[in-house]
Amino acid sequence: MPWDETYYPRSMRNLPPEVRRKAIEIANALLEEGYEEGKAIRIAIAKAREWAARGGAVWPR
């Protein structure tokens, strides 16, 4: 079942909203490619944080 802004993994709970949205987008894409759920979540969070650090989102300081 794909994730959305109201239903997402607990490990994404403390991410800033913009970063969480990106992580959800990435995780759903990885699941469609056949990745295992746990691995998709870990990769998605890391990539979303990288995206934010590159200026994709305003990261709280």
Where are these regions (language model features)?
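C-terminal alpha-helical interaction appendages
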Residues: 1-61
